[in-house]
Amino acid sequence: MSHSSTALLHPYVAARATEKFAPIYFFCHPLQSAETDVAERANKRPIWIMGHMVNANYQIDEFVNLGANSIETDVSFDSSANPEYTYHGVPCDCRGWCKKWEYFNNFLKALRKATTPGDSKYHEKLVLVVFDLKTGSLYDNQAYDAGKKLAKNLLQHYWNNGNNGGRAYIVLSIPNLAHYKLITGFKETLKTEGHPELMEKVGYDFSGNDNIDQVANAYKKAGVTGHVWQSDGITNCLLRGLDRVRKAVANRDSSNGYINKVYYWTVDKRQSTKNALDAGVDGIMPNYPDVIADVPNESAYKAKFRIASYDDNPWETFKN
């Protein structure tokens, strides 16, 4: 039957024949729209809003509900290099929550629930966790042990011994370049315990605002060749320029740089957030995510930035 032959049919039959093909016509549009969305998404830098000092279990829900898609948690160690508490202590940021705390392993269990699909406490948008490792209390020669013990704790209480544990990406943030062996201890322990594949979920950061070349040398000693986040910042009580951020961004965007992502802390003002985005950062770390979380959606920024999801690999350098 030719296309024109519907005109010869009874009006009801002709209408039904037209309806039969109508869904095909309308079905094309969502596909085109989806392709456009994917293309637009690929051209926007994914941004991680990293809630600062999330150290009590209830704060996980609180910060995600305020707009964070990632959190930073402080980890203190006992004299034997065991991770003991999630605790920052004083001094800390102006208007920050310095004294919230939890036993480290209890926090890991709560974090696992918050990042395990199907759990009643699951938050789909919580995709990255930075552990700010307070290794200043340790001797340099304890760094390897600290990494070893940290890995064992995470393996048991967060990754559930490799059996459907939490899915978030983890950044080990170390304040002292001399403690690079923490990375070695962590990596070798996961291998010894039979779960080297979990290193695919682990990245690194040296948070001491050291010279970029010195940081590169520490990674070389640790055998790290990827998964690198570079932090820069200062307490929100003080002002800090973006000079080092720009150096880190230049390293990230160069053909031979070692950095994959750059984040800036601690940012609680919208203008500071805009300045950091203008400088090209991948992450912003606020005490109050709700104050700044929608900045990437402002008209001046939404064509270039979007909030990162689990589909965004935090170890891949964004290329535009």
Curated annotation (Swiss-Prot):
GO CC aspect terms: extracellular region
Translocase is among the record's keywords: no
Cofactor(s), names only, from the UniProt record: Mg(2+)
GO biological process, any: lipid catabolic process
Record: active site: 52, 88 (nucleophile)
Molecular function as annotated in GO: lyase activity; metal ion binding; phosphoric diester hydrolase activity; toxin activity
Location(s), subcellular: Secreted
Protein name (database record): Dermonecrotic toxin LarSicTox-alphaIB2a
The organism of origin for this protein: Loxosceles arizonica (Arizona brown spider)
Taxonomic lineage of the native organism: Eukaryota, Metazoa, Ecdysozoa, Arthropoda, Chelicerata
